[in-house]
UniProtKB/Swiss-Prot annotation:
The keyword Metal-binding applies. Divalent metal cation. One of its GO terms (biological process) is regulation of RNA metabolic process. It comes from Ralstonia nicotianae (strain ATCC BAA-1114 / GMI1000) (Ralstonia solanacearum). It catalyses: 4-hydroxy-4-methyl-2-oxoglutarate = 2 pyruvate; oxaloacetate + H(+) = pyruvate + CO2. Catalyzes the aldol cleavage of 4-hydroxy-4-methyl-2-oxoglutarate (HMG) into 2 molecules of pyruvate. Also contains a secondary oxaloacetate (OAA) decarboxylase activity due to the common pyruvate enolate transition state formed following C-C bond cleavage in the retro-aldol and decarboxylation reactions. A divalent metal cation binds at D103. This is Putative 4-hydroxy-4-methyl-2-oxoglutarate aldolase. NCBIfam families: NOT-MenG (TIGR01935), PRK09372.1 (NF006875). Its EC number is 4.1.3.17, 4.1.1.112. Keywords: Lyase, Metal-binding.
Length: 165
């Protein structure tokens, strides 16, 4: 069972003050069946193109969280039901999107955490453009590959180190 993000914040106030632990801006909504998730970050930077998102989710997730910096675009969705199912089937703990998702009923049926800014019915482009395994700027914090992501109904936390057993 995952420790609630609020409890992690309370237990690590010194690391919050130093910046070793950061709280993302409270702009993300939970769309997946699993509201709480945690794992090391795998990162992507894309813009209105989810080709690399699919490529990453086709790989074994090994308990990681895919962090997608979609530039905050609200003009199309970067993750939908098919990609959430792919994430679930391949062992990803969660997907955190600085952008939109779609197929919200399908997302709610997938046993994977999905947090995003909003829902949008339009699909994205498929040009396979973007960068992977780089630091990404998410609302409220910069995230490096391998940093720990903790998400639940109360928010999203980023840590340089694992905060739980």
């Amino acid at each position: 069972m995952m420790i609630p993000v609020t409890d992690l914040c309370d237990a690590h106030e010194d690391q919050l003050a130093s910046g070793a632990v950061r709280v993302l801006a409270p702009v993300f909504r939970s769309f997946g069946a699993r509201a709480a998730f945690a794992g090391p970050a795998a990162t992507l930077k894309v813009f209105e193109d989810n080709g690399l998102v699919r490529a990453m989710l086709e790989q074994p997730g090994e308990g990681r969280v895919l962090v997608v910096d979609g530039g905050g675009s609200l003009r199309c969705a970067l993750v939908g039901g098919n990609l959430a199912k792919l994430a679930e089937d391949n062992g990803w703990e969660g997907v955190l999107v600085n952008g939109c998702v779609r197929d919200t009923r399908e997302l709610a049926a997938c046993n994977v955490g999905v947090h995003a800014l909003a829902a949008h019915p339009r699909k994205s482009f498929k040009k396979n453009q973007g960068e992977r395994d780089i630091g990404v700027q998410m609302p409220g914090a910069y995230i490096h590959p391998g940093e720990w992501i903790y998400g639940d109904e109360d928010g999203v936390l980023v840590s340089r180190e694992r905060l739980h057993d």
